[in-house]
Amino acid sequence: MKKIYRFFAVMALLLVTMTSKAQNDLALTLLPNFSYCNMYNPAIPVGSRTVIGLGISNINFSVLNTGVNYDNLFTFHNDGSVALDANKFVNSLDEHDNIIGTNFSMDVFRVGKRIGRLFIDLNYRVKFDAGLHYSRDFLGFFVNGNGNYLGKDNPANLSVGADFSLYSEMALGLQYRINDKLSIGVRPKLLVGFANLSVNNDGTKIYTDENTYSMTADVNLNISAATALDMDDISRLSDFTTYIEDMDTLIIENLFDIEENIGYGIDFGVSYTFNKHFGVAAGVYDLGYITWKDTKVKQNCKENMVINDALFNSMDDVLNMNIDFTDVYETLVDDVWGNDSIYNGGDYKTSLKTRIMLQGYYELCPLARFTAISQLYYVKEKFRPSLTLAYSGSILRLLNFTASYTMSEYSGNSVGAGLGINLGPLNVYVVTDNVMIATKYNASTMELLTSYDNANIRLGMVLTLGNRDKKKK
């Protein structure tokens, strides 16, 4: 078997087990009478005159998994027994385009104020965003062994890439109401990168001799890393072990450090209300990049590299998520990459995951609003479409609710729901874009995290003062 992609297989599994972005997390913007209606389009009018959020105003955990599906991992017999079905699993994967993504975000503070026709919205947010993509052969080689890849003309094409980013976002939203029907909005952002790891391993091929079954590999691995912390003491790959263990202090110690790893982003949009029943909006969200400095770079480009060790000793470790990342990392360094020197690299850029959105709504009455949202989401160098249909309503502006159905090319179909309560100036909400995940609360870790392509929860409390519509009257 092989050891060259041990690290990437573990990272794929770790991504699923981490505190985790359902890529269609729209439920929050669908809740009536809530100030986050303009989260993805700064032109959508905010009903409140003043908005205040501190710490827990907007917290999001989510995960995307388009490849590892629980029903495709196992065969379920009539007697209730379950058996791992390796061939079924591998054949269910896309040849090249399998994605795992995870996200955590939290608004540290938010202050918004309406002054005449202008609404000013200042927001500071911390984000962790990670994505990994891999080919069918990447897991097929591990599951089925090298017997399926015999001969010079039949290599295992192992394609894997990863991008992990921890950064902050300071955004200034400006929304201007041109008239009673038309509003425009723009939200420039200052981005500060805390840490990034970018891995590109699209050129690795594993060859198995059809007579001797000996294996060789052509490896083309490129890794770039950067952080806001001092990396002067990091000169070898093994030095990252201690660095990773101290990562939990990164946000606290460098929360407002803006000396390096600077980036810029922007959201912009337009909204138009035809009458009290119909409205449309269009916008672009998260168009931008971060430039990473003080980088460390590792490259491994080898041909005919002999490999002969296994990826994992036991499949039980995979199924039970019993994986020690530090041990795997150290083994990888010693046996595959070699604990040789890494060197200082040049600046590099990573892009935000941009969305292009078009939406329209019909409101029969406050108790019945129907919305359609079409979006293109930039994932793995492709714009991927999705469509969300939603119902939302409000009872006396006190109880607000929404239900939605999303159809997505890359994250599957899902049913979302949300509930918000306005207790005077205090607004409390909880939303999800996949309510079905709640049916797996008592399931095993593997079943919980692989039963659906995406899952998320977003919750928070925010203070709002004044009602724009009442003031107009």
Stretches found by the model and what they are:
Residues 1-26:
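Bacterial Sec-dependent N-terminal signal peptides
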Residues 23-473:
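Subset of outer-membrane beta-barrel
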